[in-house]
């Protein structure tokens, strides 16, 4: 039997370097990257790098050998090889100025078809929905880009069309569940076929060119090339699930014979589709309530009243109320407010919305409509206001959706300081730090209170002393006023003016009070005797206070942690270290957040103190002026 040589079996044969993979596939580096992105093949990290690299200590990019064998049978490899031949032939035609032949070759440009790759990577529709988060986020980002060297205009337009179609589905199915505004953009989460899909819609900022060292647009463009095919398949399936015509179309009643539709019907329809403010054409007449069947309550009742079933019932009831949250309300969006995110919010929950017709086509009613209930404004004041509507800031809509109820509009009026905008994506089970506002939202009795430091307690004592001094000053003033009144009474009425009958009555009252006091003292003495007898019968001893030594407690915790680390098996030590590191980073983040919160509370407290001092100063000055005027 032949003895196997070193690196002929085991981990050395499981991995292959990138250079060897390129040589095996006969592709260039750019084509190899493109193929790996489209097929979902990515580098691997071996357990023992030196063994995987056949004794070499140099750090190389490694792939699984079976993944490279898998790429050998891909039909796209032949298309990528055809690109080389196509480039050589077209360059030759340009050199000899054979433009007739060049035109013929350009018409036969080899195109890559990715349909079979999408079906291969996502065997079921649910698998595609699970991987839709990154897809939507990247498509929304590319839909805002202008025409660049590596991003053609057609690609940006395609991203814009696919994202608008997906938003139409979200509005029609009323599947939006959570929203949040952050520095990155607008976070949205929809529930589609039981899967939670989260994406980011970027803010409307002017495009800033980036260097190649910061952002590689070529690699991102390859991802977008695959994601556009995936999103097209997904939109087609979602639209047909709701009996909506795909591509999106409008009913014939909307396409009236006016000048706009007569000039260019295609641009008219595309503008109205982008407005997100009109119902789409359906293949059959199905009511909106029948689109997404709710959970069968009768079926749940058969399973008993377990905690899980009760929770599912409550969630189903909340979702049914949430889908009609803005029903019966009419909103008007001011010019300075971003239109698209708010239109998605309002229409997803049953509301009606419009805006200024000069901002974007698709407005359904004007600003002077008396039936408008809310106007969304993001400026400190307005010149003209209507009494019949509430003027609110955009955050009100997001907070209403996250709390699943219509909140009072008092805190969101023009010029008001907005309440904190809480994230709905916080998991109370996983996240250690929860803001006190969120705790108070769920349970008012769980408002977070941090332990006061010595400085804070000293400040509180100083405040109390100031208040006591003010109170003493006020009492002294009242005492002085009382003395002045009594002096005036003696001056005009005199103490001799008191009747003798009244003096007799007062003496009789004093005698009665003395008798009552004697009786009360006897009762108190009897009660104390009884208590003393009861105490003698009881055998309760006084307890001792044990002081906790913090140093010993900390030492015991450290020893326990070391013992726990020793008990971990050698193969699980890296995992144990990773878990401990994650725990430490979480604790550090929590400590930093609590520290920031304490600083914010201290600043607000100091501001309130300064306001109080200013108010006292103004009151003292006003009192001094009044005293001068009286004199």
Swiss-Prot record:
Region described as Disordered: 428-471, 489-560
Modified residues (Phosphoserine): 453, 457
Protein name: Pescadillo homolog
Molecular function (Gene Ontology), one example: ribonucleoprotein complex binding
Matches recorded under SMART domains: BRCT
Gene3D superfamilies for this protein: BRCT domain
Biased composition (Basic residues): 544-553
HAMAP family: Pescadillo (MF_03028)
Keyword rRNA-binding in record: no
Domain BRCT per the UniProt entry, residue ranges: 321-414
UniProt biased composition (Acidic residues): 453-471, 498-525
CDD domains: BRCT_pescadillo_like
Coiled coil (UniProt feature): 593-629
GO cellular component: nucleolus; nucleoplasm; PeBoW complex; preribosome, large subunit precursor
Compartments in which it is found: Nucleus, Nucleolus; Nucleus, Nucleoplasm
Similarity section: Belongs to the pescadillo family.
Domain of life: Eukaryota
Ranges of Basic and acidic residues composition bias in the record: 428-442, 526-538
SUPFAM superfamilies listed in its UniProt record: BRCT domain
Keyword match Transmembrane helix: no
GO biological process terms, semicolon-separated: maturation of 5.8S rRNA from tricistronic rRNA transcript (SSU-rRNA, 5.8S rRNA, LSU-rRNA); maturation of LSU-rRNA from tricistronic rRNA transcript (SSU-rRNA, 5.8S rRNA, LSU-rRNA)
Keyword field: Coiled coil, Nucleus, Phosphoprotein, Ribosome biogenesis, rRNA processing
Record function comment: Required for maturation of ribosomal RNAs and formation of the large ribosomal subunit.
């Amino acid at each position: 039997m032949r003895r196997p040589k070193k690196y002929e079996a085991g981990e050395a044969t499981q991995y292959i370097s990138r250079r060897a993979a390129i040589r095996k596939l006969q592709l260039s580096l750019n084509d190899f990257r493109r193929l790996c992105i489209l097929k979902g093949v990515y580098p691997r990290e071996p357990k023992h790098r030196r063994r995987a690299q056949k004794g070499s200590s140099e750090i190389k990019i490694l792939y699984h050998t079976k993944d490279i064998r898998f790429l050998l049978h891909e039909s796209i490899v032949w298309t990528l090889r055809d690109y080389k031949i196509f480039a050589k032939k077209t360059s030759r035609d340009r050199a000899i100025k054979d433009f007739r032949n060049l035109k013929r070759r350009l018409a036969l440009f080899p195109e890559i078809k990715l349909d079979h790759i999408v079906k291969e990577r996502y065997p079921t529709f649910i698998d595609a929905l699970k991987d839709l988060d990154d897809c939507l986020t990247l498509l929304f980002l590319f839909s805002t880009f202008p025409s660049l060297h590596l991003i053609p205009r057609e690609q940006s337009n395609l991203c814009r069309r696919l994202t608008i179609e997906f938003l139409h589905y979200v509005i029609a199915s009323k599947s939006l569940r959570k929203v949040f505004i952050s520095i990155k953009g607008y976070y949205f989460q929809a529930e589609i076929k039981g899967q939670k899909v989260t994406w980011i819609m970027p803010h409307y900022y002017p495009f800033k060119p980036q260097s190649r060292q910061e952002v590689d647009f070529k690699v991102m463009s390859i991802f977008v090339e695959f994601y556009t095919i995936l999103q097209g398949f997904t939109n087609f399936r979602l639209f047909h699930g709701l009996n909506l015509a795909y591509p999106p179309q409008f009913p014939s009643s909307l396409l009236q014979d006016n000048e706009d539709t007569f000039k260019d019907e295609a641009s008219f329809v595309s503008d109205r589709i982008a407005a997100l403010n009109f119902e789409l054409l359906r293949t059959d007449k199905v009511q909106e309530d029948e689109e997404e069947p709710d959970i069968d309550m009768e079926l749940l009742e058969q399973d008993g009243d377990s905690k899980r079933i009760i929770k599912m019932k409550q969630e189903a009831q909340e979702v049914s109320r949430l889908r009609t949250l803005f029903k019966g309300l009419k909103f008007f969006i001011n010019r300075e407010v971003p239109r698209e995110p708010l239109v998605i919010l309002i229409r997803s929950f049953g509301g009606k919305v419009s805006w200024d017709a000069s901002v974007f086509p698709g407005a359904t009613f004007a600003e002077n409509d008396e039936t408008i209930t809310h106007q969304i404004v993001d400026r400190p004041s307005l010149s003209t206001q209507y009494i019949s509507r509430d003027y609110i800031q955009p955050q009100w809509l997001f907070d209403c959706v996250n709390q699943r109820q219509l909140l009072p509009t008092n805190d969101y009026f023009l010029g008001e300081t907005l309440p904190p905008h809480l994230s709905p994506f916080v998991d109370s089970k996983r996240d250690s730090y929860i803001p006190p506002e969120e705790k108070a939202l769920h349970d008012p009795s769980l408002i977070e209170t941090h332990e006061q430091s010595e400085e804070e307690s000293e400040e509180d004592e100083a405040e109390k002393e100031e208040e006591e001094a003010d109170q003493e000053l006020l009492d002294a003033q009242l005492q002085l006023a009382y003395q002045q009144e009594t002096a005036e009474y003696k001056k005009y009425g005199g103490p001799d003016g008191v009747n003798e009958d009244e003096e007799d009555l007062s003496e009789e009252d004093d005698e009665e009070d003395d008798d009552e006091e004697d009786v009360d003292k006897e009762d108190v003495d009897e009660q104390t005797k009884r208590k003393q007898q009861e105490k003698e019968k009881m055998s309760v001893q006084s307890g001792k206070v044990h002081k906790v030594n913090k140093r010993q407690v900390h030492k015991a915790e450290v020893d326990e942690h070391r013992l726990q680390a020793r008990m971990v098996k050698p193969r699980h030590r890296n995992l144990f270290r990773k878990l401990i590191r994650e725990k430490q980073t979480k604790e550090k983040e929590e400590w930093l957040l609590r520290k920031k919160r304490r600083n914010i509370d201290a600043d607000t407290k100091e501001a309130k103190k300064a306001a109080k001092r200013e108010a006292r100063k103004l009151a003292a000055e006003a009192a001094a002026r009044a005293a001068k005027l009286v004199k």
